[in-house]
Amino acid sequence: MPKQTVALFFGGKSVEHIISIISARAVASHIDHSRYDITPLYIDRGGHWHGGACAKRILALDVAVLLRNGGQDEVFERLDEITSFDEGKRFDLTAFFDSIDVAFLTLHGSYGEDGKIQGCLDTFDIPYAGCGLTSSALSMDKALTKLCAADAGVEVAGFMSVTSADYAADPQAICNAVTERFAFPVFVKPANLGSSVGISKVHNAAELRPALDKACALDAKVLVEETITGREVEVAVLGNDDPIASVPGEIIPGSDFYDFEDKYVKSDAKLVIPADLPGEVSAAVRNAALTVFKALGCSGMARVDFFVEHGTNRIILNEINTIPGFTDISMYPMLMSASGVEFDELISRLLLLALEKRAINPKI
């Protein structure tokens, strides 16, 4: 059987740009090269597409080391230096799509995980690993995710959503509404970002406005959410119509909560796989993950995050990620590995699921 060509999309316009590159490097190292050839496609922070030698040079760049040693500024300086050689060149989108068989996306966050790139690929009839346009868009919006999950019978934390426009018009009114509805501490988070970017834990009224300022600067919609005192547990889901759920894994944060630094830079968080949960709680978490996955119409992959409340073992949805991290310290591949699906096999299965979905739904 001839090799198939996989377009590996990475980079993107979101604040998770660097993490996307790290994920892409891991995927490239674990793909079955006897079955697939990789054609990298790098999207810079301005949304410009770069293929060929430019994308290959960036994929070869060990940005994780640069990030640890020099911070984000040094990473972006190197990326800009490489892409400068592509200035003035016109990317031939049609020729690129004509040359590939299937796409694998490691575009985390906005403009990658929210349905935009999925719609583009659908237009060009390119199969891709992971969720489609609608499920991606729903899952990206934390408020809509909670509404869909609650409708399917999965418990969610109490929350209120605030538009950045309403907050800008009357910040004090929004702050008053929050303090009337919730007891502190609360979490303030952008509705459409991942990797814990822009999230603040607010302990009192004095901290509320700075947290809202921070989140509203990053997103047009913001969530204020009650704090759940419990264990942070995650489940990886893999499949299309008959998905499987991994063993649950627990995150013990190295800071006040599992933030961007814990996930990708200093790695102080402790990951426990499988999570030390009673058997019935573990089974219930896995079932809840499958329920959320199906309620949102997901396909291919997702990581579903929960809280297991101290004392009661109530299972409460936190969020879902339809393009979870694929770095060497990311939960999704580690959870699947602990469930018998190693990283190399995981990539192959995701690509096969993409082709399977297109075969069943040729017009989608």
Swiss-Prot record:
Cellular location(s): Cytoplasm
Highest taxon in the source lineage: Bacteria
GO CC, one annotated term: cytosol
Residues binding Mg(2+) 1, per UniProt: D305, E319
Pathways involved: Cell wall biogenesis; peptidoglycan biosynthesis
Binding annotation for Mg(2+) 2: E319, N321
Key word Magnesium present: yes
Domain ATP-grasp: 146-352
Family assignment from sequence similarity: Belongs to the D-alanine--D-alanine ligase family.
Protein name per the record: D-alanine--D-alanine ligase
Source species of the chain: Chlorobaculum parvum (strain DSM 263 / NCIMB 8327) (Chlorobium vibrioforme subsp. thiosulfatophilum)
